[in-house]
């Protein structure tokens, strides 16, 4: 997904990939995707490296990032997407290998700073290793910021109805640490934990301790939804809340926070470029201080 997204941009050039998979299989996985469809371009393998749209991409299979020699191919930024090197100490091996910056594609497991577009990019001070947090935090944080900036959040609970992920089981199987997580993904709605809401407190310190949440894993292949229920400091009608979110989506958060009043369902957001889209018709208010946002 990182590769496909980068290919859509003229200001990003992918020069190298490190994976324990062989190049032929990597080419196959890039060409064909059950969720996002076929790759829009040419993909070949030559001398163990990928040739994508006529450009060579170096392929390596190093287990230790320190051995990657990123400087040989002029790497500026590494997208650390293995899920294995989520601390400053381990991710710094990419810097040792010659990269200038590292972006972790999941929440860090130490105090590596997290940055979410639409929430705290303005706080970035040039750190060479950062986390982009989780997909759920990227969905929740921009919305929470708009609501807190305009109306003030006293406290809130979040539920994410989350699409199936690759870590789940196709049928019931052993899962010693998470018994429910070992149940068949296509057969069940599975309650699960998530640190996404608490992580919002790291990117928006003013909300630290005010949000927590949980997840339900559901049998859909892609697209998840966040249900945010909050108590507001400043009373506001649901229409006023919608107006504030729409203004943000057309102004400072354009391209990050979307807004729709259409009768949409989850598959309508497959390939969505915004990290968060507010569904204006799906939310409800109990009163002017207690509201559920989707």
Curated annotation (Swiss-Prot):
PROSITE patterns named among the record's database cross-references: GAPDH
Q: Which reaction does it catalyse?
A: D-glyceraldehyde 3-phosphate + phosphate + NAD(+) = (2R)-3-phospho-glyceroyl phosphate + NADH + H(+)
In this chain's numbering, which residues are marked as the site (Activates thiol group during catalysis)?
Answer: 162
Give the keywords, sorted.
Cytoplasm, Glycolysis, NAD, Nucleotide-binding, Oxidoreductase
Q: Where is the active site?
A: 135
Question: What is one cellular component GO term in this UniProt entry?
Answer: cytoplasm
Quick one: which residues bind NAD(+)? Answer: 19, 63, 105
Pfam families recorded: Gp_dh_C, Gp_dh_N
One BP term from GO? glucose metabolic process
- The EC code for this enzyme is 1.2.1.12
Query: Which InterPro entries does this chain map to?
Result: GlycerAld/Erythrose_P_DH, GlycerAld_3-P_DH_AS, GlycerAld_3-P_DH_cat, GlycerAld_3-P_DH_NAD(P)-bd, Glyceraldehyde-3-P_DH_1, NAD(P)-bd_dom_sf
Molecular function terms in GO for this entry? glyceraldehyde-3-phosphate dehydrogenase (NAD+) (phosphorylating) activity; NAD binding; NADP binding
Q: In which pathway does it act?
A: Carbohydrate degradation; glycolysis; pyruvate from D-glyceraldehyde 3-phosphate: step 1/5
Say which enzyme class the record assigns: oxidoreductase
Subunit text? Homotetramer.
User: Which family is this protein grouped under?
Assistant: Belongs to the glyceraldehyde-3-phosphate dehydrogenase family.
Function, as annotated: Catalyzes the oxidative phosphorylation of glyceraldehyde 3-phosphate (G3P) to 1,3-bisphosphoglycerate (BPG) using the cofactor NAD. The first reaction step involves the formation of a hemiacetal intermediate between G3P and a cysteine residue, and this hemiacetal intermediate is then oxidized to a thioester, with concomitant reduction of NAD to NADH. The reduced NADH is then exchanged with the second NAD, and the thioester is attacked by a nucleophilic inorganic phosphate to produce BPG.
Question: Could you tell me what this protein is called?
Answer: Glyceraldehyde-3-phosphate dehydrogenase
**Gene name of the record:** gap
């Amino acid at each position: 997904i990182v590769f496909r997204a980068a290919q859509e941009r003229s200001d990003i050039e992918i020069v190298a990939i490190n994976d324990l998979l062989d190049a032929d299989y990597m080419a196959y996985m890039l060409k064909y995707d059950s969720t996002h469809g076929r790759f829009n371009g040419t993909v070949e393998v030559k001398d163990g490296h990928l040739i994508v749209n006529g450009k060579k991409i170096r392929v390596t299979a190093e287990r230790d990032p320190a051995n990657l020699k990123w400087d040989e191919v002029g790497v500026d930024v590494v997208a650390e997407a293995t899920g294995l090197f989520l601390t400053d100490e381990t991710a710094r091996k990419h810097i040792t290998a010659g990269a200038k910056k590292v972006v972790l594609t999941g929440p860090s497991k130490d105090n590596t700073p997290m940055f979410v577009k639409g929430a705290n990019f303005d706080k970035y001070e040039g750190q060479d290793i950062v986390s982009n947090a989780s997909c759920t935090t990227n969905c929740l944080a921009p919305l929470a910021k708009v609501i807190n900036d305009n109306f003030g959040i006293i406290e809130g609970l979040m539920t994410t109805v989350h699409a199936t992920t690759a870590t789940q089981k196709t049928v019931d199987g052993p899962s010693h640490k998470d018994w429910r997580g070992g149940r068949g993904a296509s057969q069940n709605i599975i309650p699960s934990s998530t640190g996404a809401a608490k992580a919002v407190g790291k990117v928006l310190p003013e909300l630290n301790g005010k949000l927590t949440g949980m997840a339900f894993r559901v049998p859909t292949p892609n697209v998840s939804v966040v249900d945010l229920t909050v108590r507001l400091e400043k009373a506001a009608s649901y229409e006023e809340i919608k107006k504030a979110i729409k203004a943000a989506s057309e102004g400072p958060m354009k391209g990050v926070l979307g807004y729709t009043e259409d009768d949409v369902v989850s598959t309508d957001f497959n390939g969505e470029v915004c990290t968060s889209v507010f569904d204006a018709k799906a939310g409800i208010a109990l009163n002017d201080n207690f509201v559920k946002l989707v």
